[in-house]
Structures are given as C-alpha cells and as structure tokens.
UniProtKB/Swiss-Prot annotation:
This is UPF0056 inner membrane protein MarC. InterPro entries: Multi_antbiot-R_MarC. The keyword Cell inner membrane applies. Residues 29-45, 90-118, 176-196 are cytoplasmic.
Length: 221
C-alpha cells in the first residue's frame, strides 16, 4: 500500500507543475466572461472529464498512436506550440466590434442566438492543462515505469488512473471557484487577465516550438 501512495505522490509532483490548473483558471476567466454560471459549471466539468480522458489515452495508447502516425515528441511540442501561440494571439488582439449599423446589429443578433462556444476541450483541456509537455511526460513516464521495475505490477496498473483522476478533480475545483474570482475582479479585470494570458500563451507557444526545434537538432546533430 505504501508503494501505491508513493507512486501517486510522485505522479502528482511530476504532473501538477506541467498541468498547472491555476494557469487554466486564468485562461478560463479570459474566455468565459460572457457565460452564465450554469454554462461555466458545465464547461468546468467537461474540461475535467476531457483532461482525465486525454491523460488516460496518452498513458495507455500514446506511444502506439504516435508510432502509428509517425509523430515524434518534438513534432508534438511544435504542433502544441503553434496551437498555444494562435490562441494567445486571438486573446491578445481580440476582434474589434463592428459599427452599430443595421447589418451589424442583425449579425450580432444572429451570433447571439448561436450556442455558446465550447472551450472545454480546446483550449482548457488541451493544450492548457493536458498540453504537449504533459502528454510527452506521460508517454515517456509510461515507458520508463513499465520497464523500470521500481514498483510492483499492481501499483503500475492502479496508480495512473488515480493520479489522472486527482489532477482532473483539482482542475474541476479550481475552475468551479473561478466564479468568485470573476465577481471579485469585474469585467475590466477579466479583460486585463485575458490580454495578459494571451501574451503569456504566445510566449509559452514560442517556447514549446523552440524546445521542439532544439530536440530535433539534438536528435539529428
């Protein structure tokens, strides 16, 4: 049993800094400003479910999928970096509102009638929480743990789902508490957080790309 607790603790120590639920909360605040409480709670729950599912797939089938499609870890990092940077640019330079012409009003009403955009999978679950770094760590750790012999087989079987569930629950709790943060900072504060997070996401995306390129250089040098 101590081996199980040790494995769970080690997994959380490795994954939580990469998943960084607090960063996802700040991103959520920037994207969910126009959502009501019910919709924010639904997005929070779905994001947590998606994070759990992504981590499970990455652990049990990640290497197989990447080998099947010929995807390397550097390629995963570069692709994730491009997605993160694109999302950051959209947050940093939001689309300007159209002039209040009859055509603009008509289009605004038409857009208002559409369902609220689903932000649970992209960008909250991926790449913000279960991003390329998290997925790469899970895939590499899965290979190391299975062949390392440090833990008994039953621990290797039981611990990963518990670790991933714990990360998902922590994320859900953080996102659910974002409503109190929204009431505290107000609309202006949310816009400021959105711009700041956009800039940070662009920086993160560029860094992901740099890391991927450096890994390629090291691999083929």
């Amino acid at each position: 049993m101590m081996d199980l607790f040790k494995a769970i603790g080690l997994g959380l120590v490795v994954l939580l800094p990469l998943a960084n639920p607090l960063t996802t909360v700040a991103l959520f605040l920037g994207l969910a400003g126009n959502m009501n409480s019910t919709e924010r709670n639904r997005q929070s729950y779905m994001a947590s479910v998606y994070v759990f599912a992504i981590m499970m797939v990455a652990y049990y089938a990640g290497q197989l999928v990447m080998n099947t499609f010929g995807i390397s870890i550097p390629g995963l990092r570069i692709a994730g970096g491009l997605i993160v940077a694109f999302i950051g640019c959209r947050m940093l330079f939001p689309q300007q509102k159209a002039h209040e012409s009859p055509e603009a009003k008509s289009k605004s009403e038409e857009l208002a009638d559409e369902p609220t955009a689903n932000i649970a999978f992209v960008p909250l679950a991926m790449p913000s929480t279960a991003g390329p770094g998290t997925i790469a760590m899970i895939i590499s750790s899965a290979s190391t743990v299975r062949h390392g012999g440090e833990f008994p087989d039953w621990v290797i079987t039981v611990a990963p789902p518990i670790i991933f569930l714990a990360v998902a629950v922590i994320l859900w709790g953080c996102l659910r508490s974002s409503g109190a943060i929204m009431r505290l900072v107000g609309k202006g504060g949310i816009e400021a957080i959105s711009r700041l997070m956009g800039f940070l996401l662009v920086c993160m995306g560029v860094q992901f790309i740099i890391n991927g390129v450096l890994e390629i250089i090291k691999t083929y040098h």
